[in-house]
Amino acid sequence: MEWSHAFDAEILLPQADARWLTRPDRAVRTWSGTLGVLPGVTLIQCGGHFPGSAVAHWADGADGEGVLLTGDTIFVTPGEDRVTFVWSAPNRLPLPERAVRTVVEAVGPYRFDRIYGGWWQPVLRTGAREVLRASADRYVQFLRGEAAVD
């Protein structure tokens, strides 16, 4: 909260996660669905390991092809050729199928060719939209025990 006051900046909190807020403050602004935060930059509440999990879409990123900034909602794999999903990374718990489908559907209307994950993760540099859909389908096949191991 101190930094938001120092820079006169809002703290944007998805309404779905407001119950986790332990220090209410005038700087906190809740939102739901989508929220334009800058020209060409939209927050998309897509769910995931928290109901309010969100990603940012930057329409002009990747030379105008679009970028998703996903944090820990969508993980780019080390080989930079797939993405994956987790409910709890520290506990190695998978994200349920319904939540995976919700994430993919939420970003569906947006154009993007690149995905930047959180932390020091690799970057999916091209074809991200197609890779996301294919990776989600493969992930669900593994959840169901239907995937061929390659």
Protein language model annotation of sequence segments:
Residues 2-147:
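Metallo-beta-lactamase
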